[in-house]
Regions:
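Alpha-helix N-cap/helix-initiation sites
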Residues: 22, 26, 42-47
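Short, basic amphipathic alpha-helical segments that act as recognition/interaction helices
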Residues: 43-70
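Short Lys/Arg-rich basic patches
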Residues: 1-30, 34-37, 77-87
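Short, highly charged low-complexity linear segments
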Residues: 63-65, 86-89
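Secondary-structure boundary motif
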Residues: 12, 38-42, 58
Length: 89
């Protein structure tokens, strides 16, 4: 974890464009983020989170006019909600 001084410098430097996100997650999620970062040549778990939100947003946009994308999003949403206890921190 970054030192308090390093965090203060980061916040000062990026205060107008970024917000720090600290999230408690199960070990499984951390492993998944590391895998996503490795598989897509990203710069660590933070960028993997950003990529995951990018993919989700793109799929939501596709689902607005693509029935297959909507079907896949519905399946993923239902599967997550069914198994959310596995992923909950």
């Amino acid at each position: 974890m970054a030192t308090r001084e390093a965090q203060a410098r980061w916040r000062s430097r990026h205060q107008l464009v970024k917000k720090q996100l600290n999230v408690m997650a199960k070990h499984l999620i951390h492993e998944d983020l590391e895998e996503i970062a490795r598989d897509y040549d990203l710069k660590g778990k933070g960028e993997a989170v950003t990529f995951a939100t990018f993919v989700t947003k793109a799929m939501r946009q596709q689902a607005e006019y693509n029935p297959e994308a909507k079907r896949i999003m519905d399946l993923l949403e239902n599967a997550y909600k069914r198994d959310r206890d596995i992923y909950r921190p």
